[in-house]
UniProtKB/Swiss-Prot annotation:
<dbReference type="GO" id="GO:0003779">
    <property type="term" value="F:actin binding"/>
</dbReference>
<dbReference type="GO" id="GO:0008344">
    <property type="term" value="P:adult locomotory behavior"/>
</dbReference>
<protein>
    <recommendedName>
        <fullName>Tropomodulin-1</fullName>
    </recommendedName>
</protein>
<dbReference type="GO" id="GO:0051694">
    <property type="term" value="P:pointed-end actin filament capping"/>
</dbReference>
<keyword id="KW-0963">Cytoplasm</keyword>
<dbReference type="GO" id="GO:0005884">
    <property type="term" value="C:actin filament"/>
</dbReference>
<comment type="subunit">
    <text>Binds to the N-terminus of tropomyosin and to actin. Interacts with FLII.</text>
</comment>
<dbReference type="GO" id="GO:0030017">
    <property type="term" value="C:sarcomere"/>
</dbReference>
<feature type="region of interest" description="Disordered">
    <location>
        <begin position="36"/>
        <end position="61"/>
    </location>
</feature>
<comment type="function">
    <text>Blocks the elongation and depolymerization of the actin filaments at the pointed end. The Tmod/TM complex contributes to the formation of the short actin protofilament, which in turn defines the geometry of the membrane skeleton. May play an important role in regulating the organization of actin filaments by preferentially binding to a specific tropomyosin isoform at its N-terminus.</text>
</comment>
<dbReference type="Pfam" id="PF03250">
    <property type="entry name" value="Tropomodulin"/>
</dbReference>
<dbReference type="InterPro" id="IPR004934">
    <property type="entry name" value="TMOD"/>
</dbReference>
<keyword id="KW-0009">Actin-binding</keyword>
<dbReference type="GO" id="GO:0070307">
    <property type="term" value="P:lens fiber cell development"/>
</dbReference>
<keyword id="KW-0206">Cytoskeleton</keyword>
<dbReference type="GO" id="GO:0005523">
    <property type="term" value="F:tropomyosin binding"/>
</dbReference>
<dbReference type="GO" id="GO:0005829">
    <property type="term" value="C:cytosol"/>
</dbReference>
Length: 359
């Protein structure tokens, strides 16, 4: 309370009256103190923070040329410092003499048989090119000329050694034809349980609506003939993955499911993998190359579900971590080993898988 009482007596003070009573020197001192209290003052450059330290009037105008002349005259009048050891002009060491370049040896003339000299004298550039290839002088020609000369008995290099090198003729590759699958017709055939329809390929058809893809998953629940279902590059997302997961829990015929290159997140992938224990017919699943990485946690959960499944033989996904990759590889290897044992023993009942680590 006493502190508040002390502040009340300063409440009615007139600041203009106090500042008007200060002298010029006191105002300058107050200004310097206020600048030091300014928090933004520390962020200014040094040249702007620093105030004038003196008010002394200049003794004369600034003349740059006269100042330079004065400095030059003062430098000339200053006596140079004498050397501690006087220079005598004595030369030490040997005078450098450049080495003479070796003379090129004179090439001796090679004497050939008259028939060879006449043949080489009348040979064309194309014939000389083939002769150089036969003699192994491949540095004188391009690779194409060299191999053409060796692969044929006739003269193939018509251009000669000094010709312009031509590139290999480009063979145009035609673009892949678009997917010709009729989406609506195929959906009706699945709903009607068409026995001739065993593979559904909707790859790279980007204009399929999400409700239509969910309708495909709903129709596959009761279908008894479709064994392969692929929707690569159809912009499928999590709702489609959820519908496919529900389909896997009821479908008992589908063997291959491919959902690569889509927009399915980790939650959708997990839902698909969690449906594997309810499905005993699926032997291959591909989920790689989604729009976003799944992450280490999702990969570990995927591996845990794969280790509990004894029917899946192929799993298409590239694990980013070494641990999940090794565990998934071992799980698929064990499942394939069970199939091999069942085939060799010709068993009809289920085989109990051997114990696995982490299950």
């Amino acid at each position: 309370m006493s502190y508040r009482r002390e502040l009340e007596k300063y409440r009615d003070l007139d600041e203009d009256e106090i500042l008007g009573a200060l002298t010029e020197e006191e105002l300058r001192t107050l200004e310097n103190e206020l600048d030091e209290l300014d928090p933004d003052n520390a962020l200014l450059p040094a040249g702007l923070r620093q105030k004038d330290q003196t008010t002394k009037a200049p003794t004369g105008p600034f003349k740059r040329e006269e100042l330079l002349d004065h400095l030059e005259k003062q430098a000339k009048e200053f006596k140079d410092r004498e050397d501690l050891v006087p220079y005598t002009g004595e030369k030490r060491g040997k005078v450098w003499v450049p080495k003479q370049k070796p003379l090129d040896p004179v090439l001796e003339s090679v004497t050939l048989e008259p028939e060879l000299e006449e043949a080489l004298a009348n040979a064309s550039d194309a014939e000389l090119c083939d002769i150089a290839a036969i003699l192994g002088m491949h540095t004188l020609m391009s690779n194409q000329q060299y191999y053409q000369a060796l692969s044929s008995s006739s003269i193939m290099n018509k251009e000669g050694l000094n010709s312009v090198i031509k590139p290999t003729q480009y063979k145009p590759v035609p673009d892949e034809e678009p997917n010709s699958t009729d989406v609506e017709e195929t959906l009706e055939r699945i709903k009607n349980n068409d026995p001739k329809l065993e593979e559904v390929n909707l790859n790279n058809i980007r204009n399929i609506p999400i409700p239509t893809l969910k309708a495909y998953a709903e129709a596959l629940k009761e279908n008894s003939y479709v064994k392969k279902f692929s929707i690569v590059g159809t912009r499928s997302n999590d709702p489609v993955a959820y519908a496919l997961a529900e389909m896997l829990k009821e479908n008992k015929v589908l063997k291959t499911l491919n959902v690569e290159s889509n927009f399915i997140s980790g939650a959708g992938i997990l839902r698909l993998v969690e449906a594997l224990p309810y499905n005993t017919s699926l032997v291959e699943m591909k989920i790689d190359n989604q729009s976003q990485p799944l992450g280490n946690k999702v990969e570990m959960e995927i591996v845990s579900m794969l280790e509990k499944n004894a029917t899946l033989l192929k799993f298409g996904y590239h694990f980013t971590q070494q641990g999940p990759r090794l565990r998934a590889s071992n799980a698929m290897m064990n499942n394939n080993d069970l199939v091999r044992k069942r085939r060799l023993a010709d068993l009809t009942g289920p085989i109990i898988p051997k114990c696995r680590s982490g299950v």
